[in-house]
Amino acid sequence: MAAVETRVCETDGCSSEAKLQCPTCIKLGIQGSYFCSQECFKGSWATHKLLHKKAKDEKAKREVSSWTVEGDINTDPWAGYRYTGKLRPHYPLMPTRPVPSYIQRPDYADHPLGMSESEQALKGTSQIKLLSSEDIEGMRLVCRLAREVLDVAAGMIKPGVTTEEIDHAVHLACIARNCYPSPLNYYNFPKSCCTSVNEVICHGIPDRRPLQEGDIVNVDITLYRNGYHGDLNETFFVGEVDDGARKLVQTTYECLMQAIDAVKPGVRYRELGNIIQKHAQANGFSVVRSYCGHGIHKLFHTAPNVPHYAKNKAVGVMKSGHVFTIEPMICEGGWQDETWPDGWTAVTRDGKRSAQFEHTLLVTDTGCEILTRRLDSARPHFMSQF
């Protein structure tokens, strides 16, 4: 606590002279908050800390209030590229959004190539980290916050809203929770979340295309807080969708949950792909092979590797204390994919739709804990859109 000129204590019911100011208020530039003692400061903390959140929100809004994009929208930025489906990018993208300096950042956040040196140091290893009780609490917190941010995005899904607007809201929601949006600058990814529409399998870059009636869109959120990452995604309906979209999204969610039901100590990671592919194929769908679930904790992506297709060669056996994601990508047509010239947007080669759901899971002694579960409902958002 820093000593300042005499003021009156801000604690309700206390009129003592106050010479102590909250250090966080000083850092954020909040004026007029003084306390007479550490006891009054601690006693007022539950209400006083709300000033910090308000100040951070206002600062973030000021930082983005002047952002504009001028000029016409370009829906064909890569001359000669043959798109696999009807979706087109809408360029130019908005400028990269800044993250305030008071937010803790992962090691890749300011790297010119977005490289994570901590991940690179462990590249190729199959050793799976057993999380300590402290690690687990860190993961529970960041996963709960990631869920809150995805729920913010879910409330925006409707025709006419752009994925750029969703990304903007996600960015601000991360900052309001003292979190860094993990995708931002990860190997130079330019946005704070991934938004994958229709034939986009994953890693779609938010842009100025308005969502259209009948679209399906996946929003993939990862937050970084206190040294830990929390990761989840859901696929949503945009307005009224056809029966094919409903079946695809429902089946994809069922694939995820059937795999989660199998998670417990002693199960081989390779077994999850058998479960997922069996259910997908039974419903006439295919499973993407190029992208997998992964270990996650202090590293965004690490061991284990968790393929979603059958007869895979994944290494490792589940143990209590492992944390990883399951995130099956299920397609209407073939599983083959290709990548747009932006280097990120993965699309189905045949242009047919793809859906995805993801949870971060903690293996427990008897099964698993879904760290990114909804706290207000056991249902994913799309079930409320029927």
From Swiss-Prot:
Modified residues (N-acetylalanine): A2
Zinc-finger keyword on record: yes
Top-level EC class as recorded in UniProt: hydrolase
Cofactor annotation comment: Binds 2 divalent metal cations per subunit. Has a high-affinity and a low affinity metal-binding site. The true nature of the physiological cofactor is under debate. The enzyme is active with zinc, cobalt, manganese or divalent iron ions. Has high activity with zinc; zinc cofactor is transferred into the active site region by the ZNG1 zinc chaperone.
GO molecular function: aminopeptidase activity; initiator methionyl aminopeptidase activity; metalloaminopeptidase activity; metalloexopeptidase activity; zinc ion binding
Pfam families recorded: Peptidase_M24, zf-C6H2
Cofactors that this protein relies on: Zn(2+); Co(2+); Mn(2+); Fe(2+)
Principal place of residence: cytoplasm
GO BP: any one term: platelet aggregation
Catalytic activity: Release of N-terminal amino acids, preferentially methionine, from peptides and arylamides
RNA-binding as UniProt keyword: no
EC number: 3.4.11.18
Homology family: Belongs to the peptidase M24A family. Methionine aminopeptidase type 1 subfamily.
Name the record gives this protein: Methionine aminopeptidase 1
